[in-house]
Amino acid sequence: MSQGRSRGKAKGVEEFRPYVTRALPVGARVTCADNSGAKVLEIIMVQKAKTRVSRLPAAAVGDYVNVVVKKGPAELRKQVHGAVIIRQKYPVRRLNGVRVAFEDNAAVLTTPEGEMKGTDIKGPVAAEASEKWPRLANLASMVV
């Protein structure tokens, strides 16, 4: 019979992740910061979002979301894609007390495994997103 133990990690020990305010609700439009061809994305679903009844799920930096391309080439429009949020306007408080806010809300198109559909990221990437998605950090020109 099973002992109820988890494999790999010690029981009760989990990786610490600081809280990031969720500032991008479902329906928010964000700019696409990669070279896939898409210009504007609309968030239609936040993966693994736990929320209250009747409250819109919202995303923060580093979250994986389902999006629809609103402006871009015809082959990308009218279908659901995955994306990772890399910047948000609302300030993110770091553990050292610094608050970081960006000029725009931005995301990059990705697969569920974390592989980017484009080959380049325009602008900076938040450190919270690069820690959670290491493949994005490899392509980022600047991590803030």
Curated annotation (Swiss-Prot):
Pfam families: Ribosomal_L14. GO terms for molecular function: large ribosomal subunit rRNA binding; structural constituent of ribosome. Gene3D superfamilies: Ribosomal protein L14. PROSITE patterns: RIBOSOMAL_L14 (PS00049). One of its GO terms (cellular component) is cytosolic large ribosomal subunit. The keyword rRNA-binding applies. SUPFAM superfamilies: Ribosomal protein L14. Keywords: Ribonucleoprotein, Ribosomal protein, RNA-binding, rRNA-binding. CDD domains: Ribosomal_uL14. InterPro entries: Ribosomal_uL14 (IPR000218), Ribosomal_uL14_CS (IPR019972), Ribosomal_uL14_sf (IPR036853). One of its GO terms (biological process) is translation. Part of the 50S ribosomal subunit. Forms a cluster with proteins L3 and L24e, part of which may contact the 16S rRNA in 2 intersubunit bridges. NCBIfam families: PRK08571.1. Belongs to the universal ribosomal protein uL14 family. Binds to 23S rRNA. Forms part of two intersubunit bridges in the 70S ribosome. This is Large ribosomal subunit protein uL14. It comes from Cenarchaeum symbiosum (strain A). The lineage of its organism: Archaea, Nitrososphaerota, Candidatus Cenarchaeales, Candidatus Cenarchaeaceae, Candidatus Cenarchaeum.
